[in-house]
Design a protein with these regions (language model features):
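Active-site catalytic pocket residues across diverse enzymes, especially alpha/beta-hydrolases
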Residues: 20, 24, 93, 108
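N-terminal Rossmann/SDR dinucleotide-binding element
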Residues: 1-73
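Active-site beta-alpha loop architecture of Rossmann-like, nucleotide-cofactor-dependent enzymes
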Residues: 38, 80-84, 122
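NAD(P)H-binding glycine-rich loop region in Rossmannoid oxidoreductase-like domains
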Residues: 59-95, 107
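SDR active-site strand-loop-helix element
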Residues: 6, 32, 74-78, 115-121
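Conserved Rossmann-fold NAD(P)-dependent oxidoreductase catalytic core, especially the SDR/UDP-sugar
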Residues: 102-125
Length: 125
């Protein structure tokens, strides 16, 4: 099984990439992150029961089809989640959260990948 996790070294992603290895031993896990949160330690001491690769990039500007080719599932976690700061950075939040998600969804359709996407409590205001 080949799984892509966007936002892989964020708060939820850093736990998920480890849990996937135990749930799906032998799987290939492709981690995508823009390193905005600078949680580099999340990449250390990954389980050996899965094969990991890391792609640094911005979902709004990167070409996703080559990465999603042959992927079974994409778990889309990449988002700016700072509700308070989003007012001051509305364009950045819209670009990252809306356009990034749209590009992921289109690439999943074009590559016949299933898509799992999450939200946050921030959607409630």
């Amino acid at each position: 099984m080949k799984i892509v996790v966007t936002g892989a070294i964020g708060h939820i992603g850093s736990y998920l990439i480890r849990d996937l290895a135990s749930q799906f031993p032998g799987s290939e896990i492709v981690m995508i992150d823009n390193l905005m949160t600078q949680r580099f330690p999340s990449l250390f001491n990954l389980p050996t029961s899965a094969k990991y690769s890391f792609v640094e990039g911005d979902l709004t500007s990167m070409e996703l089809n080559p990465i999603f080719n042959g992927v079974d599932t994409v778990i889309h976690l990449a988002a700016i989640t700072d509700a308070a700061g989003s007012v001051d950075n509305a364009e950045l939040v819209e670009s990252n959260n809306f356009i990034g998600t749209e590009k992921v969804a289109i690439a999943c359709l074009e590559n016949a990948c299933s898509l799992i996407t999450l939200s946050s409590t921030s959607v409630y205001g």
